[in-house]
Amino acid sequence: IHLVTQQRKNKNYSGCIVTNPNCTSAGLTVALKALDDAFGVKKVFAVSLQALSGAGYPGVASLDIMDNVIPNIKGEEEKVEWEPRKMLGKFNNGKIDLADIRFSAHTNRVAVTDGHTVCVSVELTRQTDPQTAEAILRDFSAAESARELPSSPRPVIEVRNEADRPQPRLDRMTGKGMTTVVGRVRRDPILDLKFVVLSHNTIRGAAGGSIYNAELLVSENLL
């Protein structure tokens, strides 16, 4: 919201340009935000398994992806390593100061129609245990200004306790595709915690996220 006001001031116009984050960063950062608020996040190691729909149309050639995993998505790793730091950063003197988080990402294209899965390990500033982290994730809520908007995810984060969840086919439409689903929260022997994040890339990460942004701008009398 502060960036919209600053943009109008800088450009001397009444409109605004609002961009969505990368569809992988969108869901991942929701989970990181909850943990960062509670414990502080110092380091993130993330491996994405990204759906075919994220490649757009006409997408990935069928003979390239059938019976296969493509271990590189051009330009994606750089986005996933940078965008969450911006989203978790602070507005300061007309710009965003990036969050002080060290980030490493691998991005992979997999033969899934919709739903990006990210396997995440984090190092925290303040130690915690998996059960407490699960409770923090489960109780996380949107900013007060966004909680009652029509597209606001309900819940923001759903925590699954099954050993084999979340899965794209089973969980991507949770909260009409706007909820971020987290599972397999456990201790990490190298960092502190590890877990799996699933979000619907074309709903939460694209069209639904755009509508959510527009609703927020209307509610704040910026449109």
What are the roles of these predicted feature ranges?
Residues 42-192:
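C-terminal substrate-binding/catalytic lobe of Rossmann-fold NAD(P)-dependent oxidoreductases
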Residues 1-72, 102, 126, 180-181, ...:
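N-terminal Rossmann-like NAD(P) cofactor-binding subdomain of oxidoreductases
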Residues 194-198:
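Low-complexity, intrinsically disordered segments enriched in Ser/Thr together with acidic residues
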Residues 77, 203-207:
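Short, charged, low-complexity patches
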Residues 27, 129, 205-206:
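Secondary-structure boundary/capping motif
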Residues 108-112, 199-204:
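Glycine-rich phosphate/pyrophosphate-binding beta-alpha loops
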